[in-house]
């Protein structure tokens, strides 16, 4: 086609970098593209010359031969000979712009079905508070996709096999024009597979996959909380065409407990004591995740006061460290008193005015005895 100097055609120096050559070619190709210059043979000629020049200068081997021997160094060596027709130029243009912009172009070829990773699966698991606190092993029943044993995964009925898609010629892609670009899109007939199944397998309906139910043992670590996700690699759906399987995500939901309330890895309980116990102090027994433990309530304990028992909470995930048990004391006020109890309380009230400590303490003990606390 052109015998003009290729560097002159693109408007770059002879020592221009590959990136500079790409940028300049892109600029010229957009400027002189026939869609932007209808009925302009001069622009079409410039477009073709730019494509020919870029075809040589982008290739290190062709460029080296051109730099040394000029156009003569390209004769019979796949470069500098021009393009047979306009389709060659546009295909070349699409190839280059696909390379420049990172999208698939009309020259892209699919080499048969591509490996596809399997889909990830989600399983919502509800467990008891005790299971979350101590950890447990549970068995999940999950849907499972397996290769059809009738067609060995081909999807074709016995005695038949998949055929090359006639619509795309087995490429899995067809060309479509968008403006002055030609891009490649998946073939609508074979859905990008490059092949079709004329007679589908009756067992799997042509999918090559069967649905089954499987059982999977899952270890629940101690300390999990609602919303925690357990990832089981490779336990999702199988991949297609040799692709890797997906993962299984077990999303945990922990049921509420009647005794314990959760605050992170700490546990909270409310323990009721009489006002005599609160006033004089006492030793009480409180529940834990294991056996009950003894807690000393000091004299003068107020309702709502919280006592902390260290390492009696929930374990941190992946650690031996545990949270604490918080015991919130609630002081009960008696609602039904005997006559003697009322008299003692009135005596207590009188003594409270002057606060003679020993006498108050003595009456308080009497009240406790009258109420069956001692």
From Swiss-Prot:
InterPro entries: DnaJ, DnaJ_C, DnaJ_domain, DnaJ_domain_CS, HSP40/DnaJ_pept-bd, HSP_DnaJ_Cys-rich_dom, HSP_DnaJ_Cys-rich_dom_sf, J_dom_sf. Coiled coil: none annotated. A zinc finger (CR-type) spans 135-213. The keyword Zinc-finger applies. Binds 2 Zn(2+) ions per monomer. It is found in: Cytoplasm. Zn(2+) 2 binds at residues 165, 168, 187, 190. GO terms for cellular component: cytoplasm. Keywords: Chaperone, Cytoplasm, DNA replication, Metal-binding, Repeat, Stress response, Zinc, Zinc-finger. The keyword Transmembrane does not apply. One of its GO terms (molecular function) is ATP binding. GO terms for biological process: chaperone cofactor-dependent protein refolding; DNA replication; protein refolding; response to heat. Its cofactor is Zn(2+). CXXCXGXG motif repeats lie at residues 148-155, 165-172, 187-194, 201-208. Residues 5-70 form the J domain. CDD domains: DnaJ, DnaJ_C, DnaJ_zf. Zn(2+) 1 binds at residues 148, 151, 201, 204. SMART domains: DnaJ. NCBIfam families: DnaJ_bact (TIGR02349), PRK10767.1 (NF008035), PRK14301.1 (NF010894). The J domain is necessary and sufficient to stimulate DnaK ATPase activity. Zinc center 1 plays an important role in the autonomous, DnaK-independent chaperone activity of DnaJ. Zinc center 2 is essential for interaction with DnaK and for DnaJ activity. Belongs to the DnaJ family. Participates actively in the response to hyperosmotic and heat shock by preventing the aggregation of stress-denatured proteins and by disaggregating proteins, also in an autonomous, DnaK-independent fashion. Unfolded proteins bind initially to DnaJ; upon interaction with the DnaJ-bound protein, DnaK hydrolyzes its bound ATP, resulting in the formation of a stable complex. GrpE releases ADP from DnaK; ATP binding to DnaK triggers the release of the substrate protein, thus completing the reaction cycle. Homodimer. This is Chaperone protein DnaJ. It comes from Nitratidesulfovibrio vulgaris (strain DSM 19637 / Miyazaki F) (Desulfovibrio vulgaris). The lineage of its organism: Bacteria, Pseudomonadati, Thermodesulfobacteriota, Desulfovibrionia, Desulfovibrionales. The gene is dnaJ.
């Amino acid at each position: 086609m052109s015998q003009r100097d290729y560097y002159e055609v693109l408007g770059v120096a002879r020592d221009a970098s590959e990136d500079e050559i790409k940028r300049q070619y892109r600029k010229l190709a957009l400027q002189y593209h026939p869609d932007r210059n209808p009925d302009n043979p001069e622009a079409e000629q410039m477009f073709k010359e730019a494509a020919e020049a870029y075809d040589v200068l982008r290739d290190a081997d062709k460029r080296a031969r051109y730099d040394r021997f000029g156009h003569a160094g390209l004769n019979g060596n796949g470069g500098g000979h021009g393009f047979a027709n306009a389709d060659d130029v546009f295909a070349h243009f699409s190839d280059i712009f696909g390379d420049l912009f990172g999208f698939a172009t009309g020259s892209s070829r699919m080499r048969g079905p591509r490996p596809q990773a399997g889909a990830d699966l989600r399983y919502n698991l509800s467990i008891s508070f005790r299971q979350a606190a101590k950890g447990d092993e549970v068995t999940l029943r999950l849907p499972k996709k397996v290769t059809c044993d009738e067609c060995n995964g081909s999807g074709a009925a016995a005695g038949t096999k998949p055929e090359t898609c006639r619509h795309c010629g087995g490429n899995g892609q067809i060309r479509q024009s968008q403006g002055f670009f030609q891009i490649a899109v998946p073939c609508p007939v074979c859905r990008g597979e490059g092949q079709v199944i004329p007679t589908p397998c009756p067992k799997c309906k042509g999918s090559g996959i069967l649905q089954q139910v499987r059982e999977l043992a899952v270890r629940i670590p101690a300390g999990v909380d609602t919303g925690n996700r357990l990832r089981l690699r490779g336990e999702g759906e199988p991949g297609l065409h040799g692709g890797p399987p997906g993962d299984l995500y077990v999303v945990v939901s922990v049921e509420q407990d009647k005794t314990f309330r959760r605050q992170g890895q700490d546990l909270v309980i409310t323990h009721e004591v009489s006002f005599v116990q609160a006033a004089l102090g006492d030793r009480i027994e409180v529940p834990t995740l294991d056996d009950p433990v003894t807690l000393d309530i000091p004299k003068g304990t107020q309702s709502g006061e919280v006592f902390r028992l260290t390492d009696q909470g929930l374990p941190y995930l992946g650690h031996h460290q545990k949270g604490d048990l918080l015991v919130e004391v609630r002081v009960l006020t008696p609602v039904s008193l005997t006559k003697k109890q009322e008299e003692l309380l009135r005596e207590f009230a009188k003594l409270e005015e002057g606060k003679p400590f020993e006498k108050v303490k003595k009456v308080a003990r009497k009240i406790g005895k009258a109420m069956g606390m001692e």
